[in-house]
Swiss-Prot record:
Superkingdom, natural source: Eukaryota
Main location per the UniProt record: Golgi
Sites carrying sugar chains: N187
Pathway annotation: Protein modification; protein glycosylation
Cellular localization per UniProt: Golgi apparatus membrane
Transmembrane segment boundaries: 7-27
Organism: Saccharomyces cerevisiae (strain ATCC 204508 / S288c) (Baker's yeast)
Protein known as: Alpha-1,3-mannosyltransferase MNT2
Length: 558
């Protein structure tokens, strides 16, 4: 009888714990992450023992059909989340069990090589002067960011791989610029480095590649990053990081194009990297990005994408995404009022409304991202799992998996609050009905401004159109056919420098982003009408001069 009473009491207590836990989830506050509760070493890790034998957080192939995508994604995310919580809450691990779980959670890591030939597993980093550092942790001065020394990686077999990565491979608090580049991005990478020199960047730079950057390309990059060193145009502290050996050969080739950015962000030597696309152009000091309020509060810096109202989710896709969010964090996204009741951060709440109520697909612009890996590593690993999950085809590239990984991990994040903007040459719109200023900007460049209207950065390079679409556009776009004599003339125009005269932040509730159909569908137009819609920022003459200098440097022949 006593045994039955004890059992009854245990069941009741467990029920109370579950009720409290799920009530926390259902009143989700994205500013304060909720950690799942567990007690005891065995109780935490035993979750994995109850999984279907042979389970694996495998990569899904494009268009791979799965009968229950929501269930599959919830399981992917939950396995990573519980692993992270167990590491936080349990002292002393069964190392063999830990290793077995890691291999299944992160199959893209070459754990077999780590166990059988550790030296061959570790990555190689090459400095601009030819110095090669293998299996080493790099240390930089936290004040002037100069390289200090390297230390051999001392892998602690009593810790998980990712704990080792944070504590024995990565210098605590280190900051720097990370660029994912292969031979394909050579020219754009060089142009970005020239701009970084112009703005007098003093942070170290790592070019991360998956054995797809040739020695000749590295020599060219070094030349443009280091030659003619002056106070006004300082040489850059440049490093090349080859991560190929870290990857399971079965998965290495799956990291292509934009998905290579996950490798750069994850395996860079810096704990707090600022990730840039090769066609990103910063206009302020790198320190300015680290100082932005959103990063200071959350440890991540995300910028908004264009609000595109004509590229929408299918209702069936949103149904699955709602199931995933509810299954992972208990957030009900069925209507607008519930979203704003449950989510404290108004910027995040608006993004969720745009996605789940208005069906918009594009929310985050990943041309520049900062992520504190000490605070957000497992959210980022969740993002990687999502990138190769059944919902990958719902989204365009890597962009929105950055914030979705944070959301489904229930981690603290937000967006820079200023909407994305269009930058370029101001065109007067002739209207009999309008007496005030009426402007249009059409460009491929997506710009981002601070609260005071100052230009922070843009994505898309600094020529008219970087896409090789001039022949198609000349044949299919009447406007361009009328403007140019032939496709070769259009090609020259596309290669010419942009003119940065102003910025329009459109009022998307009245007049949003309009795709012109030009430049491989990357050209968008926005409107500003004084007193009616949009926000206009006109550059003053001194600012135009500075911007034109950056445009000239970026476009100079290589």
């Amino acid at each position: 009888m006593r045994r039955k009473n004890r059992l009854f009491i245990l069941v009741v207590l467990l029920g109370i714990v579950l009720v409290v836990y799920y009530s926390q989830l259902n009143s989700l506050d994205l500013v304060e992450p909720v950690q799942s509760s567990s007690s005891g070493n065995g109780g935490c890790w035993s979750y994995y023992e109850g999984l279907t034998p042979g389970w694996l957080n495998d990569f899904y192939d494009v268009n791979q059909i799965t009968p229950n995508p929501a269930k599959d994604v919830i399981e992917l995310v939950t396995r990573i989340k519980i692993f992270f919580n167990c590491l936080q809450q349990v002292d002393g691990h069964n190392i063999q069990r830990l290793r077995d779980i890691e291999k299944k959670l992160f199959p893209y890591i070459n754990f077999e090589k780590l166990e059988t030939d550790e030296s061959a597993f570790w990555h190689t980093t090459t400095r601009w002067n030819g110095e090669v550092y293998h299996a080493s942790m790099l240390e930089f001065d936290p004040k002037n960011h100069q390289f200090l020394r390297s230390k051999p990686i001392n892998f602690d077999t009593g810790l998980s791989f990712w704990e080792n990565w944070l504590h024995t491979v990565t210098q605590s608090g280190s900051k720097g610029i990370v660029i994912s580049a292969s031979d394909v991005q050579l020219n754009e990478t060089i142009r970005l480095l020239k701009v970084l020199r112009f703005i007098k960047n003093d942070y170290p730079i790592q070019i991360v590649h998956n054995a797809d950057l040739s020695q000749d390309s590295m020599k060219s990059i070094i030349k443009y990053a280091r030659s003619l060193d002056t106070a006004e145009y300082p040489a850059q502290e440049l490093w090349f990081l080859n991560v190929h050996s870290l990857l399971n050969p079965k998965y290495s080739k799956k990291f292509t194009t934009y998905s290579n950015k996950w490798l750069a962000l994850t395996f860079s030597s810096f704990e707090i990297p600022i990730l840039m696309d090769s066609d990103t152009v910063p206009f302020v000091s790198i320190e300015k990005f680290y100082e932005l309020e959103e990063f200071q509060k959350t440890g991540v810096l995300f910028f908004k994408d264009r609000v595109i109202s004509d590229d929408l989710f299918e209702s069936s896709e949103l149904k699955i995404l709602r199931e995933i969010v509810y299954g992972c964090i208990g957030l009900d996204l069925e209507d607008e009022s519930k979203i704003h009741e449950q989510v404290e951060d108004p910027v995040v709440a608006q993004v969720l409304e745009n996605m789940f109520i208005k069906k918009y697909k594009h929310h985050l612009e990943s041309g520049l991202v900062i992520l504190h890996k000490g605070k957000h590593l497992f959210s980022m690993l969740t993002s990687i799992a999502l990138q190769f999950s059944p919902i990958a085809e719902y989204f365009h590239g890597d962009k929105d998996f950055f914030w979705l990984g944070e959301l489904l991990s229930n981690n603290r994040f937000t967006f820079h609050p200023v909407d994305a903007s269009n930058i370029g040459q101001l065109g007067n719109v002739v209207s009999k009905e309008s007496t005030g200023e009426f402007y249009q900007i059409c460009s491929v460049q997506l710009s981002h401004t601070d609260r005071d209207g100052s230009l922070l950065w843009l994505n898309g390079g600094l020529n008219i159109c970087k896409k090789t679409s001039w022949e198609y556009d000349y044949e299919h776009r009447q406007r361009l056919n009328d403007m140019f004599q032939n496709a070769d003339e259009l090609r020259e125009y596309y290669a010419s420098p942009v003119k940065l005269e102003g910025i329009i932040i459109p009022d998307t509730s009245i007049s949003g982003w309009i795709n012109s159909g030009e430049c491989f569908l990357f050209n968008y137009c926005t409107l500003f009408k004084e007193g009616e819609f949009g926000k206009l920022i006109k550059f003053k003459e001194d600012e135009k001069l500075r911007l034109s200098q950056i445009v000239d440097i970026w476009n100079k022949d290589i």
